[in-house]
Amino acid sequence: MGVSFSKLFSNLFGHKEMRILMVGLDGAGKTTVLYKLKLGEVVTTIPTIGFNVETVEYKNISFTVWDVGGQDKIRPLWRHYFRNTEGIIFVVDSNDRSRIAEAREVLQRMLNEDEIRNAVLLVFANKQDLPEAMSAAEITEKLGLHSIRQRPWYIQATCATSGEGLYEGLEWLSTNLKNQA
């Protein structure tokens, strides 16, 4: 009984660590999201060729966030980051209507991978500060999110440069990752 109680106590009050994979098309704002969460400031970025990894602390949880480059030629490498991934953050450029179908295809293909079948999905509808940005509801439809039945998912409107919506997304992740444990 002591072991059960200590595990329960740890689950309720202890410090958790969670592995998060952040992906999306190139130019969606993944690296800007990562460093806004980590440093609280906007950093100058260049296209990510490999990956960035940082630990973001939020509400007694250490999120180890792997930000992986989104260029077409790099996407096949994403699968090398799938092992032990508990949550996926898929970042979408809400202002880029010309690539939303490509984003849907990439997301659907990735979600079919067996190694991440138990990972929860958070979609950041990024760049909401731009006047032509699609709403979270429109992106939900265009990505076909309502057809996802095998995992918990959530979409959050965000603006990585201001930080708007980022912590709301982490809040959803922390709640849903606790439920998975």
Curated annotation (Swiss-Prot):
One GO BP: vesicle-mediated transport
Residue ranges crossing the lipid bilayer per the database entry: none
Sections of the chain in a coiled coil: none
Record keywords, A-Z: ER-Golgi transport, Golgi apparatus, GTP-binding, Lipoprotein, Myristate, Nucleotide-binding, Protein transport, Transport
Residue sites binding GTP per the record: 24-31, 67-71, 126-129
Gene Ontology terms: cellular component: cytoplasm; Golgi apparatus; plasma membrane
PANTHER family: ADP RIBOSYLATION FACTOR-RELATED
Protein name (database record): ADP-ribosylation factor
Species lineage: Eukaryota, Fungi, Dikarya, Ascomycota, Saccharomycotina
Gene transcribed to yield this protein: ARF1
